[in-house]
């Protein structure tokens, strides 16, 4: 019997954040029938979609926020999300990640503190860069320190490339192809993987050995290249010296989700170099459907790759342990 599922890369837009992302990105969302409405809604329609996907608890987060929302917009967006969850007919089916003004690390730390301490959020899901800038500098230590103090994870989530980054994906094909290559078709996934490696190389995990980072989409390319990156990190002077090698940081500081990756092939790779305790189910709703996620999980059940106990770990137990939540096992 398929275990209940806990999904934690599941998206939403508050009015404050939707208004901040710019007309271009609003039009992009509205170009997919029903997508904008699904992102703006936390009502019964979302609960029904969760039921169809056997999801007992959904951790809601704002989707990508290109352009970088202000601290005021993030505060309003988090307040709106908390209020909407409280008004749902079954609020125990939901938890939340905070949206943060990532261009301002000090303001991000303050909003993370407020969202966790006052609103009961279980961490933050943030854009992978702020106008092309990753968060490996010492100016972001204030954010990592706050996450460690609160003992909550930070989910590094792909976002659209900056204008400068986007130029690298244009070529001898129509502009929409370049846009796709720079985004979900390829580019924003390895950019998250690169960010994690930069955090390691910059000593962030040395300064904050209890930092908890989540990456989605089967590890954002990292599992496939982990052995080579680990080897390169120690050669020709290395990326350090570091207190712990990359493989140890991978085992102790990184969690990955299955979001939007409906094939067993990448999971087979992951199981060769990643502890099952660090793998968590997710969908990427509403960009992906809960039903498709359930189909994939049933395929995983029948594959024999995991024991019954391990299936439950991926389905919900690992996320419960990381987020310190306890979902209802029966809907």
Swiss-Prot record:
Keyword annotations from UniProtKB, A to Z: Decarboxylase, Lyase, Metal-binding, Zinc
Coiled-coil regions listed: none
SUPFAM superfamilies from the UniProt entry: Metallo-dependent hydrolases (SSF51556)
Cellular-component GO terms for this entry: cytoplasm; cytosol
Pathway, per record: Secondary metabolite biosynthesis
Broad enzyme group: lyase
Inducing stimuli: Expression is induced by an intimate physical interaction of the fungal mycelia with the bacterium Streptomyces hygroscopicus. Expression is repressed by VeA and MvlA via histone 3 acetylation by the SAGA/ADA complex.
E.C. numbers: 4.1.1.-
Example of a GO MF term: hydrolase activity
Pfam families tied to this protein: Amidohydro_2 (PF04909)
Matching InterPro entries: ACMSD, Amidohydro-rel, Metal_Hydrolase
Annotated S-S bridges: none
Disruption phenotype: Fails to produce F9775 A and B, but accumulates gerfelin and continues to yield orsellinic acid.
Function: Decarboxylase; part of the gene cluster that mediates the biosynthesis of orsellinic acid, as well as of the cathepsin K inhibitors F9775 A and F9775 B. The non-reducing polyketide synthase orsA produces orsellinic acid by condensing acetyl-CoA with 3 malonyl-CoA units. Further modifications by the decarboxylase orsB and the tyrosinase-like protein orsC lead to the production of F9775 A and F9775 B. The functions of orsD and orsE remain unclear since only orsB and orsC are required to convert orsellinic acid into F9775 A and F9775 B.
Family of this protein: Belongs to the metallo-dependent hydrolases superfamily. ACMSD family.
Name listed for the protein in its UniProt record: Decarboxylase orsB
Species assigned in the record: Emericella nidulans (strain FGSC A4 / ATCC 38163 / CBS 112.46 / NRRL 194 / M139)
């Amino acid at each position: 019997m398929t275990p209940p599922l806990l999904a934690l890369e599941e998206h939403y837009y508050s009015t404050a954040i939707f208004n901040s992302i710019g007309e271009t990105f609003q039009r992009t969302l509205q170009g997919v029938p029903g997508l904008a409405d699904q992102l703006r809604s936390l009502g019964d329609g979302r609960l029904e979609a969760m039921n169809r996907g056997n999801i007992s608890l959904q951790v809601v987060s704002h989707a990508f926020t290109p352009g970088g929302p202000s601290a005021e917009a993030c505060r309003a967006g988090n307040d709106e999300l908390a209020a909407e969850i409280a008004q749902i007919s079954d609020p125990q089916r939901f938890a939340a990640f905070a949206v943060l003004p990532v261009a301002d690390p000090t303001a991000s730390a303050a909003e993370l503190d407020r969202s966790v301490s006052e609103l009961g959020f279980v961490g933050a899901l943030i854009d992978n860069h702020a106008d092309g800038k990753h968060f490996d500098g010492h100016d972001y230590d204030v954010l990592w320190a706050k996450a460690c103090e609160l003992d909550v994870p930070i989910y590094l989530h792909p976002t659209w490339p900056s204008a400068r980054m986007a130029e690298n994906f244009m070529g001898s094909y129509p502009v929409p192809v370049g846009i796709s290559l720079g985004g979900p078709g390829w580019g924003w996934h390895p950019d998250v993987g690169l960010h994690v490696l930069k955090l390691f190389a910059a000593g962030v995990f040395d300064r904050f050995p209890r930092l908890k980072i989540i990456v989605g989409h089967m590890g954002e390319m990292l599992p496939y290249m982990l052995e080579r990156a680990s080897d390169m990190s120690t050669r020709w002077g290395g990326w350090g010296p570091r207190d712990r090698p990359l493989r140890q940081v991978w085992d102790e500081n990184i969690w990955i989700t299955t979001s939007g990756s409906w094939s067993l092939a990448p999971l087979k790779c992951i199981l060769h170099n990643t502890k099952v305790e660090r793998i968590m189910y997710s969908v990427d709703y509403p960009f992906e459907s809960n039903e498709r996620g359930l189909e994939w999980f049933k395929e995983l059940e029948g594959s024999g790759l995991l024991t019954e106990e391990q299936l439950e770990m991926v389905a919900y137990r690992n996320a419960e342990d990381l987020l310190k939540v306890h979902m209802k096992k029966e809907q």
